[in-house]
Amino acid sequence: MTTLDLTASFKAYDVRGIVGETINEEAVRAIGAAFVDVLGLSGETVLIGGDMRPSSVPFAQAFAEGAASRGAKPVLLGLISTDELYFACGKFNAAGVTFTASHNPAAYNGIKMAMAGAVPVSSDTGLFEIRDVAQGYLQDGLPASVENPATITELDVLADYSDYLRSLVDLSAIRPLKVVVDAGNGMAGLTTPAVLGDQLLSALPLDIAPLFFELDGTFPNHPANPLEPANLVDLQRAVVEHGADIGLAFDGDADRCFVVDELGNAVSPSAITALVARREIARAKAAGEETPVIIHNLITSRAVPELVEADGGRPVRTRVGHSFIKAVMAKEGAVFGGEHSAHYYFRDFFNADTGMLAAMHVLAALGEQDGVLSELADEYEPYSPSGEINSEV
């Protein structure tokens, strides 16, 4: 049997490959063992979850077995969004992984890794060392298991995650809003009823119209990548048909959120960045922070730094890349960061990105005033976007 070449699936910030071709259970078991050995996690808790892709559950089990064999205490979190992993790593101060290929097609799966406190594992912080050690284990066999490996346990963090998000943005007193949510058959189909609905907590003044909430890693309706305009069409149509105030679209692992206004038009992520930045600056100033820092990446609209400065904050421009941005968030003590790709980072969320918390800020801003979203969004994006051109070199 040919040994998999892990260089095909290990990227700069995560692991992604085609199931059965560049990633399989044997490889995942070796990666689990290497994760513990490289990061020095013997005797420590390791949190393990995954999305709705068919391979995520067996991959999580295989990773747990590999981690346990090297002395870690694996805890299976079950089906989770990626930001649930970051929450759990922050809350329990433990390292963890989640199996997801985010918005990639159904044939793919992958791994996003974090250290204790939700600090990302990337090529700069051990990811390639994990790859190399795991490659050795695949070629030569796993080391002998530790004596008395820990029992693999289970934990559901959805209720704690939902309660924590609600503690950061109070939606209980906003005006009633009609909200269409397109989960794209991804993990937002699990998290939305818990956070915004009344599945686990008290009801909010939100009338939610669900679109593709059934968890299905084959993505039968459309790819779970709202960055592509074609994948927003169903949501845009539904918002108009329902006469909704707002539409929300999440990607497959629900760490990114895109917004549609009442007319069915997509709202620029730069406008969302500016809107949330204003709210976070005001909150930080109310808590006594003199000049709150806001992170924005290279391709956000210039409206973002202009608004931040006008509101008494300090904008810091960074290059693209979630691991890099999280590091800058921590270094600068930034209260919030936004990317034009609709990744939104919060100091109060362990410097990690969470689409759901960003969505809650938008709902709060909309529901705390009487105007429509299209007019509100125009305040935050006064410039015409030029779009992006991606070139391979």
Where are these regions (language model features)?
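Gly/Ser/Thr-enriched, mixed-charge loops and adjacent short helices
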Residues: 109-242
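Short glycine-rich phosphate-binding loop at a beta-alpha junction
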Residues: 43-51, 178-180, 292-298, 335
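Gly/Ser/Thr-rich active-site loops/lids in small-molecule metabolic enzymes
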Residues: 200-205, 210-212, 265-284, 322, ...
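Phosphate-binding and adjacent anionic-ligand microenvironments
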Residues: 246, 286-393
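Glycine-rich phosphate-binding loop
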Residues: 94-108, 113, 239-261, 265-266, ...
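An N-terminal, well-structured beta->alpha segment
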Residues: 1-63, 69-70, 151-176
